[in-house]
Amino acid sequence: MVDMGGLDNLIANTAYLQARKTSDADSKELQRRRRSLMLPGPQSCEQLRQAMPADFNSLCEQQPIGRRLFRDFLATVPAYQEAMGFLEEVQSWELAEEGPAKGSTLQALVATCAVAPNPGQPHSFLSPALVTKCQAATTDEERASLVEQAKAEAMAFLQDQPFREFLVSPFYDKFLQWKVFEMQPVSDKYFEEFRVLGKGGFGEVCAVQVKNTGKMYACKKLDKKRLKKKSGEKMALSEKEILEKVSSPFVVSLAYAFESKSHLCLVMSLMNGGDLKFHIYSVGERGLDMNRVIFYSAQMTCGVLHLHSLGIVYRDLKPENVLLDDLGNCRLSDLGLAVQIQDGKPVTQRAGTNGYMAPEILMEKASYSYPVDWFAMGCSIYEMVAGRTPFKDYKEKISKEDLKQRTLKEEVRFQHQSFTEEAKDICRLFLAKTPEQRLGSREKSDDPRKHHFFKTINFPRLEAGLVDPPFVPDPSVVYAKDVDEIEDFSEVRGVEFDDKDKQFFQRFATGAVPIAWQEEIIETGLFEELNDPNRPAGCGEGNSSRSGVCLLL
């Protein structure tokens, strides 16, 4: 007899894997769609030009297309290009691995600052006083300090006249055209949907592909009726707004937020490598090799620090919520329980996952803040090493109350042979019962990245994506449950929507998220394609009398 469930799963996986392989703009259908696209005409950008704040950091640093076009503009003026080139050399030096070569680069940078490009004329972006200091520098400590000063002067130079000239240049006009293109309405017709990857309390997560770029994403589909029936609107909007605010290589990115007739949809980074819980318990022996534990812990720490810097407490850090991408880098996911700290006030609502919640959450009167995430970090590191959580053995049956009492009263024990002294120490510090004694929150400058557990990690290089992961997922494997193992939801009946609901849906469905969308446009080659002046006739910029955005869906 034919196993129809197995056949359905095979078909779903095959289509999904094929889509992943062809997401690089090589399909004929994708090329056909792209030929129908064009940027809006310049006249359609005038309203946006008046409304767009002249914010250098946003326009020229944070937004990928703005950053790209600003650098293209700088390349047209030698003095501006020189300043930009110097900043790029400084960044290369900052990210270089320690050693003699880095010291030589430092000396070369200071020598560049000390020698004027033309006899008797200092660099246009450096003050004469700084040039003189560079000429007199004799120690590496002096040189490093002078390079920092030169970096600040070069950046201040670019933010002045070059930025003002950029704002009245054709390069900025092109940026505005891309911004109008970015603001087009988004619906479910924008995507091709593939297999379901999992289910949650309010809906499902499935793989989707953007029809016009080929980019693959994960789409979290929240059932509108289920949200209303369970009063989940506030949580859904909170997750969306927090994801929108975060731009970190260590936290999943939100690319689109839209609504269909039946769902609110969050389109996020597709992490093909599975979650850390799967790798801890379902691949080989329980637990992970120490080099993987250190690498993932370092990236998780960076992710938590990024959230905290934005005033966000994660509240649900655990291996199940840490996902691997194609290359083996990890990101924090599922920010449904994340909360924004308001005016420094502690959180009093109990939330989290049993076994990972800090003692202060479990108290009779909960009152807590950022330190709860460091406690969960300790639980997660322990679990990656030992293949069990600190206060409950693998597959042990225990009540929530007993687990709570263990968390509140018992000291952590390290019986697994894989624990190194550094691993034991960082777990003890993260698992301190009181927030004031916990690593990451003992004082304002308490940085977990400085712990000797991370002595092999170069954090600036890690944040720049220059450290190779110790494990790369198999691209031919689908790290998700079989489709027939994922339960279907029963239909929600008797729920009707009123005007207030419709207003909420519109507030949620804001379309493309600028940074993630612009990264997609550049990464998939659409930026170069639509900017190509030699593009065939009929595939150029839009007619100025129309919106100019032509989409074939």
Swiss-Prot record:
Autophosphorylated in vitro at Ser-490. Phosphorylation at Ser-36 is regulated by light and activated by cAMP. Belongs to the protein kinase superfamily. AGC Ser/Thr protein kinase family. GPRK subfamily. Residues 455-520 form the AGC-kinase C-terminal domain. One of its GO terms (cellular component) is cytoplasm. PANTHER family: G PROTEIN-COUPLED RECEPTOR KINASE/RIBOSOMAL PROTEIN S6 KINASE, RHODOPSIN KINASE GRK7. It is an enzyme of class 2 (transferase). Although the protein is present in a diversity of vertebrates ranging from bony fish to mammals, the mouse and rat orthologous proteins do not exist. It is found in: Membrane. It catalyses: L-threonyl-[rhodopsin] + ATP = O-phospho-L-threonyl-[rhodopsin] + ADP + H(+); L-seryl-[rhodopsin] + ATP = O-phospho-L-seryl-[rhodopsin] + ADP + H(+). The lineage of its organism: Eukaryota, Metazoa, Chordata, Craniata, Vertebrata. ATP binds at residues 197-205, 220. InterPro entries: AGC-kinase_C (IPR000961), GPCR_kinase (IPR000239), Kinase-like_dom_sf (IPR011009), Prot_kinase_dom (IPR000719), Protein_kinase_ATP_BS (IPR017441), RGS (IPR016137), RGS_sf (IPR036305), RGS_subdomain_2 (IPR044926). This is Rhodopsin kinase GRK7. It is a lipid-anchor.
